[in-house]
Amino acid sequence: MLQISLWKRLVILGLCLAALITAAPNMFYARVEGHNDAVSAFEKTGAMTETQEAAKAAWPDWAPSALVNLGLDLRGGAHLLAEVHLGEVYKARMDALWPEVRKVLAAERATIGAIRRVPSPEGELRIQIGERAQIARAVEVARTLASPVVSLTGVGQTDYEVTGEGDTVVFRLSEAEKKATDDRTMQQSLEIVRRRVDAAGTREPTIMREGTDRILIEVPGIGSAQELKDLIGTTAKLTFHPVLSTTSNPNAPVASGNELLPDAERQGLYHLLDEVPVVTGDDLTDARPTTDDNGAPAVSFRFNVSGARAFGDYTAGHIGEPFAIVLDGKVISAPTIQAHIAGGSGIITGRFSIEEATDLALLLRAGALPAGMTFLEERTIGPELGADSVKAGMVASVIGFVAVVAYMIASYGLFGFFSSVALFINIAFIFAVMGAIGGTMTLPGIAGIVLTIGTSVDANVLIYERMREEIRSGKSPVRAIELGFDKAMSAIIDANVTSFLSSAILFVLGAGPVRGFAVTTMIGIAASIFTAIWVVRLMIVIWYGWRRPKTIVI
């Protein structure tokens, strides 16, 4: 018998109703987006402007408000491809290692003689010893600083390779440690870029690693690529160093272990600093814009426990000495230590504007990029172009939908109309699922929807053609409908599973636009199996139970 149990009917109707309700906010995109932005602003600040209150009132709070996010090509925005300078991290590792090496080798001075650091290529640390004949002993002692690499691919290897070349001990990062360092650096860079972009209030950015040392950044809705570069391109590397001396000579001699940096405010003034910082921005727990004693914009900061201890110990032992605050290779402040600073907090003053102080605090809170970046590609897509893309995509979708509906009704009559209703519900499922999972719609994604519109009725074509064959062979209408669904099922499942797997491979191996196409196609395929089989079958069962026709025309 042509029957569907009550609970199955309720489940099918419930899923269809849920999809239509969840997808509905996308029909009022601007209104719902304004409502969501106002709610988000209220959650952050606890207050709303009159404009935000009006925007919030434009959409009911009880109604669904999940939207499909528009990608860069539909909303407009900025695209950047950045290269991370991994070599800087290698150098920083060697610089941080030097004090430990100096300590262990100094303990062997009676045997190996005097030690001194000599210039080294990037990623190496070279220490010259006084007693050339004792190089083997120096290498043996230095190797005690090497530790096992913490990674699956580096099992059995140490982080440093220590060798002797003449009278010089040479430290190098092992290949396993380089790979592990690269992965950590890229992961940290991705996270910090994501924090900075999120802190600026942008919507649904795409931030992902490409290759060994590159990061793809796409932010819809931002004004320009330059604005995005200003937001994420600053390293915001904050360090605190002892000041050894000041000079106006940019070519003043610099001993090994020291560095000469320019003053950010006073042109022509340079500070000779100890290269090893007392504390770094990694020890910061908070940074906020504030004002100094004169009411000028400044930035307050606070260290974590270890940073506060190191900062307090240093200030206690160096009262009356200058102390440099270095940001991105420039000395932004070099105050004299007036007293022991035990609280682990302080203030950065300078000739900041309010906006500069706010931006600096944001960057410091987000954390310092572990290495500098070079932008290899930059592209700005204007909102007008994005709007044109949305319009073109909508036109293509409507034309495709109307053409498919016209063909199905012309070919299969009332049953074609049932398929058209199911097709509309299928599209609603795509938008409902995309909105629920926070997916981003791109121009290729719209192409995936158009493709789904054309292919989702394939299952019904197979079913209807099978029904026609059964009717021609003399079967009753009820039996023809049952056999049409039953005998076409295996072909429908096989075709859709292979298509789904192909789209899944595109999603896994592809990137950017290809993944957008794959996502909408996979959702469309999954929805089409449900709508073409169960939704259409339910409509036919309800119609047949109501009309009880002696014959059916398909």
Swiss-Prot record:
Domain of life assignment: Bacteria
One GO MF term: protein-transporting ATPase activity
The keyword rRNA-binding is assigned to this record: no
Location within or outside the cell: Cell inner membrane
Membrane-crossing segments per the record: 10-30, 392-412, 414-434, 435-455, 491-511, 516-536
A GO biological-process term: intracellular protein transmembrane transport
Signal sequence bounds: none
Membrane topology note: Multi-pass membrane protein
Any GO CC annotation of this UniProt entry: plasma membrane
NCBIfam families, sorted: 2A0604s01, secD
Function: Part of the Sec protein translocase complex. Interacts with the SecYEG preprotein conducting channel. SecDF uses the proton motive force (PMF) to complete protein translocation after the ATP-dependent function of SecA.
Quaternary data: Forms a complex with SecF. Part of the essential Sec protein translocation apparatus which comprises SecA, SecYEG and auxiliary proteins SecDF-YajC and YidC.
UniProt-recorded name of the protein: Protein translocase subunit SecD
